[in-house]
């Protein structure tokens, strides 16, 4: 039987996506990345069809001996590159990781302090997201506008007065590190726990260009495995031997996860090995690129946030585009030119402006993995200028983008010799390996 039209449509859409985002666009979404061909090859395996409720070697299903092995190996590898003692890879996203931690630390009606939304707090930290769904009251710590960060002195006073169950640091618009070591002693002094959401910066932490929150006093760290850490989409939880981790790990199943999408595990393990060998050079290039892009945009007349602080210490760059029509309009205009960014609230925006905020959030981690360096950041800034300031024909700029991408199609910071995979081929299953 030949393919029905519906199936042809599915295949056409999938192919179009692959061609467009893998070969024709500048992918500058700060929460995305790309796996290596090696990691993708193990992502497509029999694990994607299987279940494994519970922890390794303590499953509720049979047939999990290789799942136990790969999950244990992946956790060991992640602990090694993170310099941590505990890892749980069962959360299927960073938000699920947050939910699992928040639920253990507080009951409905309890209070939690979070980094101010202006300093980048993720929606899962707020009443609009996971905290609200769990019935936990969120109170924002004071904002230091000059440093685009938590106001340390005022936050300490608030911690002492409120005595929350826990405090959350980390964010989604995250240019500069939050004050973990400054706040940790005061959090612990009132009997609270310090949670660090490192979803965006985990790859920078294991790459040693961003301080480790666990070494600075955080009790527990949640992450995503697909942002600056370029693995499969998923979440993880780390600690340095805290009792909180044990409590969370006991309740992830059955509270928040049943099966935990086992095909993630070998791909996460492969990415951890890649980052063991290439992570530091990758993270260093990411931060050099973000700084270079910020400076290049500023030189071309854009209002880049954080000038007095050197613009950024992460993979992100934030740009105020109000004078050009706002974040919603400009993000769509850039997409027409095959430049993919997202609109984003800036520190002075009101939360209700989320649909049309002042700014753009730009992330350089994916294009860095394709091999781009500082000189390409200059080119990207020039493309922004052509679209936004010079108002060039977006179709002409799109041609330039596609032409630029022709030289950056191969994933870097990985192992090159794919021929070594041949001996692991599972041809009878028609899988890559």
UniProtKB/Swiss-Prot annotation:
It is found in: Cytoplasm. Transmembrane segments: none annotated. Its EC number is 2.1.2.-. The modification N6-(pyridoxal phosphate)lysine is found at residue 227. One of its GO terms (biological process) is tetrahydrofolate interconversion. The keyword Cytoplasm applies. It is an enzyme of class 2 (transferase). (6S)-5,6,7,8-tetrahydrofolate binds at residues 121-123, 243. GO terms for cellular component: cytoplasm. Pathway: Amino-acid biosynthesis; glycine biosynthesis; glycine from L-serine: step 1/1. HAMAP family: SHMT (MF_00051). Homodimer. Catalyzes the reversible interconversion of serine and glycine with a modified folate serving as the one-carbon carrier. Also exhibits a pteridine-independent aldolase activity toward beta-hydroxyamino acids, producing glycine and aldehydes, via a retro-aldol mechanism. This is Serine hydroxymethyltransferase.
């Amino acid at each position: 039987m030949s393919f029905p039209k519906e199936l042809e449509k599915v295949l056409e859409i999938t192919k179009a996506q692959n061609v467009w985002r893998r070969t024709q666009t500048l992918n500058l979404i700060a929460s995305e990345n790309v796996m290596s061909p090696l990691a993708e090859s193990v992502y497509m395996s029999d694990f994607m069809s299987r279940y494994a409720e519970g922890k390794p070697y303590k499953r509720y299903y049979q047939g999990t001996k290789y799942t136990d092995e790969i999950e244990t190996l992946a956790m060991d590898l992640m602990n090694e590159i993170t310099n941590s003692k505990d890892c749980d890879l069962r959360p299927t996203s960073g938000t699920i990781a947050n939910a699992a931690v928040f639920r253990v630390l507080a009951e409905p009606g309890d209070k939690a302090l979070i980094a101010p939304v202006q300093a980048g707090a993720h929606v899962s930290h707020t009443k609009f997201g996971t905290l609200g769904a769990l019935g936990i009251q969120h109170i924002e710590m004071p904002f230091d506008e000059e440093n685009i960060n938590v106001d340390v002195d005022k936050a300490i006073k608030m911690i002492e007065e409120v005595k929350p169950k826990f405090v959350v640091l980390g964010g989604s618009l995250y240019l500069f590190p939050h004050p973990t070591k400054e706040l940790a002693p005061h959090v612990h002094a009132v009997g609270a726990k310090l949670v660090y959401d490192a979803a965006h910066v985990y790859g920078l932490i294991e790459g040693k260009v961003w301080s480790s929150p666990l070494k600075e006093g955080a009790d527990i760290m949640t992450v995503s495995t697909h942002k600056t850490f370029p693995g499969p989409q998923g979440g993880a939880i780390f600690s340095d031997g805290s009792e909180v981790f044990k409590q969370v790990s006991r309740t992830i199943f059955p509270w928040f996860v049943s099966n935990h999408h086992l095909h993630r595990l070998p791909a996460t393990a492969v990415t951890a090995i890649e980052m063991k060998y290439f992570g530091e050079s990758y993270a260093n290039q990411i931060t050099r690129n973000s700084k270079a892009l910020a400076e290049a945009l500023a030189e071309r007349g854009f209002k880049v946030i954080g000038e007095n602080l050197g613009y950024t210490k992460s993979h992100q760059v934030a740009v105020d585009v109000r004078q050009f029509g706002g974040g919603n309009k400009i993000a769509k205009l850039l997409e027409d030119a095959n430049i993919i960014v997202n609109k984003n609230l800036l520190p002075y925006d009101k939360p209700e402006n989320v649909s049309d905020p002042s700014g753009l959030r730009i992330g350089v981690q994916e294009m860095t993995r394709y091999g781009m360096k500082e000189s390409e950041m200059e080119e990207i800034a020039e493309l922004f200028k052509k679209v936004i300031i010079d108002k060039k024909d977006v179709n002409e700029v799109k041609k330039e983008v596609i032409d630029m991408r022709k030289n950056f199609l191969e994933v870097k910071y990985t192992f090159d010799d794919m021929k070594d995979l041949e001996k692991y081929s599972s041809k009878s299953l028609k899988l890559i390996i």
